[in-house]
């Protein structure tokens, strides 16, 4: 009979097969009350599942990450229960867990409304209050088919067809409602009280726009009401920081239907874009990169040689001219290999670092487009390093240091790094993978920061490191990457002459720091809520007069600021100074300069910040020095 070993090393013996819940009850009623599921021999199981042999057991509660995931998954089933009670004609599809929540895809003869969502949420609360047990039944395949046939759940039947090897499946019963899942799920609805439905959107069966359209109901769920309230507060703050709203309020950019996924940059937004580009250009020049420019449209044969045509054609914009097929480039790498291939290269020439602010276009699904965060036309701070196998380690180490320095300049101190290693299907021999993976791991260790290993998550052509930023709301944004490529140099005939006077393929390192300018600017807007550090602010100073008699002096101050490289404007409107200050504060301009008769007479300016702090009266030269110091500190400088 089973001996159960607990995480602290304690053991419990039973003279009969025992469920996870029974083990929890034997430890104490408090633990049993909070038992969501169990981890038996490192495998998640339901609380009702029996343990028949000697095993290790961890009791899973809502405090555990796995417990929270199970709660969210069970909430998705609860959505199904409520929907079927309110809308019997609905057909249930799938309801997975996503980051911080869940969703359920549903077929309905009409779109759900916000009133429908409110009704579904209310019904879910009533079902939770019934405090019913969720019953699991392992069911033979034929019986599963009969259950869903009798209920008219055609999508569930299609999912069963996708699993021909499964002889029995888990059916989870929420009273009269039944759903199919591998589980585990909560044993009782009492664990589901801290939830909220968040939005409705469209989806497609199997994610394919050619298939029938579905409705997707999103929700979030947490271990307790306090966590839920904190999440809702964070989401409300995120909505206030939505880059689309701020972009409109600050006149940065707009999107329109005639050019879906393409950005119309306004003067203010384009200023931020140019500051980023000029900054990255200098960073790359200072670190040994050669800036190049390659064509936007390239003959389709190059994409066939590179392999993109076979694997990426659905995301490529194509065109035809004079009996030739072309593609608008979705990425820059094949073009950079063409530049490398011009002229014979020696091992003495390596590494060669080619950088481009590459304008790319990808035919992303219209439903996935999101402001400037997810677009069809974008510019990458793209570069490719061509090096020998022995140079991988140093190049990666240098890139990691450079990337972390750049992120600090933008005010991001928390950076997550992940190393993705060889998948089962791959090109290149194991010795090359061993060398590349060790080089990347050693470079990460040398950086002195924590990093995460993702076994098997690398691309088929090489391992990679991903860099993710954490913003002020705790959200994580994957931005930078460095990717070893053993494949493209071979496909596109890139080679160099070795020290032994033989030909060999270089290793190609794909790398980007910001990712795309558009998305990175969107991240900055939301991180700073539009209150950009002075070096990124489209307008750094606004000079305002109190009466018309100071207008000429105000323009002279603006001219001097511009002569010294500051981005400055004047506000000479015949309005009260308080009104002008309030209006320019809403525009998030870092410094507001006021000139009255006294300032004109003394040749000074009165300076206040956008937060309302009065910095007092100072000379124009002193103010210029102040701004230049702030700009030099970049994202490390906070305007009080």
Curated annotation (Swiss-Prot):
GO biological process: threonyl-tRNA aminoacylation
One Pfam family named in its UniProt record: HGTP_anticodon
Full protein name: Threonine--tRNA ligase
Family: Belongs to the class-II aminoacyl-tRNA synthetase family.
Molecular-function annotations in GO: ATP binding; metal ion binding; threonine-tRNA ligase activity; tRNA binding
PANTHER family found in the cross-reference section: THREONINE--TRNA LIGASE, CHLOROPLASTIC_MITOCHONDRIAL 2, THREONINE-TRNA LIGASE
Binding-site residues, Zn(2+): 333, 384, 510
Statement: the UniProt record of this protein carries the keyword RNA-binding: yes
Keyword tags: Aminoacyl-tRNA synthetase, ATP-binding, Cytoplasm, Ligase, Metal-binding, Nucleotide-binding, Protein biosynthesis, RNA-binding, tRNA-binding, Zinc
């Amino acid at each position: 009979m089973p001996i159960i070993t607990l995480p602290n090393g304690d053991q419990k013996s039973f003279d009969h097969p025992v469920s996870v819940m029974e083990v929890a009850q034997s430890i104490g009623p408090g633990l049993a009350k909070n038992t969501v599921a169990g981890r038996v021999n490192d495998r998640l199981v339901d609380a009702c599942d029996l343990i028949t042999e000697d095993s290790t057991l961890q009791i899973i509660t809502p405090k555990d990450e796995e417990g929270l995931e199970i709660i969210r998954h069970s909430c998705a089933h609860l959505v199904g229960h409520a929907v079927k009670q309110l809308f019997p004609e609905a057909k249930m599809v799938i309801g997975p867990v996503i980051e911080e929540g869940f969703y359920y895809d549903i077929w309905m003869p009409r779109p759900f409304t916000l009133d429908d969502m409110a009704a579904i949420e209310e019904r879910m609360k009533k079902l939770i209050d019934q405090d019913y047990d969720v019953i699991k039944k392992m069911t033979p395949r034929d019986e599963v088919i009969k259950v869903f046939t009798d209920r008219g759940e055609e999508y569930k039947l299609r999912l069963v067809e996708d699993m021909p090897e499964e002889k029995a499946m888990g059916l989870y019963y929420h009273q009269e409602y039944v759903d199919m899942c591998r589980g585990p799920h909560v044993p009782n609805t009492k664990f589901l009280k801290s939830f909220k439905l968040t939005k409705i959107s469209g989806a497609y069966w199997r994610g394919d726009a050619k298939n029938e359209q579905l409705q997707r109901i999103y929700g979030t769920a947490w271990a307790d009401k306090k966590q839920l309230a904190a999440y809702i507060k964070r989401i409300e703050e995120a909505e206030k920081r939505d880059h689309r709203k701020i972009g409109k309020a600050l006149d940065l950019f707009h999107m329109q239907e005639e050019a879906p996924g393409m950005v119309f940059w306004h003067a203010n937004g384009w200023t931020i874009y140019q500051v980023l580009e000029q900054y990255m250009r200098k960073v790359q020049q200072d670190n040994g990169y050669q800036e190049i420019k390659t064509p936007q449209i390239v003959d389709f044969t190059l994409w066939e040689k590179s392999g993109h045509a076979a694997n990426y054609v659905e995301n490529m914009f194509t065109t035809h001219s004079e009996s030739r097929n072309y593609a608008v480039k979705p990425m820059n790498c094949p073009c950079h290999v063409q530049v490398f291939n011009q002229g014979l290269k020696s091992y003495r020439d390596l590494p060669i670092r080619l950088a481009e602010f590459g304008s790319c276009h990808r035919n992303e699904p219209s439903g996935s487009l999101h402001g400037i965060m997810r677009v069809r036309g974008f510019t990458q701070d793209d570069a490719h390093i061509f090096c020998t196998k022995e140079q991988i380690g140093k190049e990666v180490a240098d890139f990691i240091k450079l990337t972390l320095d750049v992120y600090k300049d933008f005010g991001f101190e928390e950076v997550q790094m992940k190393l993705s290693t060889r998948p089962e299907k791959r090109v290149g021999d194991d010795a090359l993978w061993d060398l590349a993976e060790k080089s990347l791991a050693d470079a990460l260790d040398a950086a002195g920061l924590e990093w995460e290993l993702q076994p098997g998550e690398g691309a088929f052509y090489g391992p990679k490191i991903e860099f993710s930023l954490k913003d002020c709301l705790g959200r994580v944004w994957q931005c930078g990457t460095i990717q070893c490529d053993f494949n493209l140099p071979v496909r596109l005939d890139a080679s160099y002459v070795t020290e032994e006077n033989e030909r060999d393929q270089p290793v190609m390192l794909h790398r980007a720091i910001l990712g795309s300018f558009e998305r990175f600017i969107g991240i900055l807007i939301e991180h700073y809520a539009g209150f950009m550090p002075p070096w990124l602010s489209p307008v750094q100073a606004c000079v305002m007069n109190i009466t018309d008699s100071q207008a000429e002096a105000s323009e002279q101050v603006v001219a001097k600021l511009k002569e010294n490289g500051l981005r400055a404007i004047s506000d000479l409107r015949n309005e009260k100074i308080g009104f002008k200050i309030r209006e320019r504060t809403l525009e998030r301009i870092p410094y507001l300069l006021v000139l009255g008769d006294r300032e004109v007479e003394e040749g000074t300016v009165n300076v206040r910040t956008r937060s309302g702090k009065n910095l007092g009266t100072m000379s124009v030269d002193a103010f210029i020095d102040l701004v230049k110091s702030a700009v030099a500190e970049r994202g490390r400088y906070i305007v009080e």
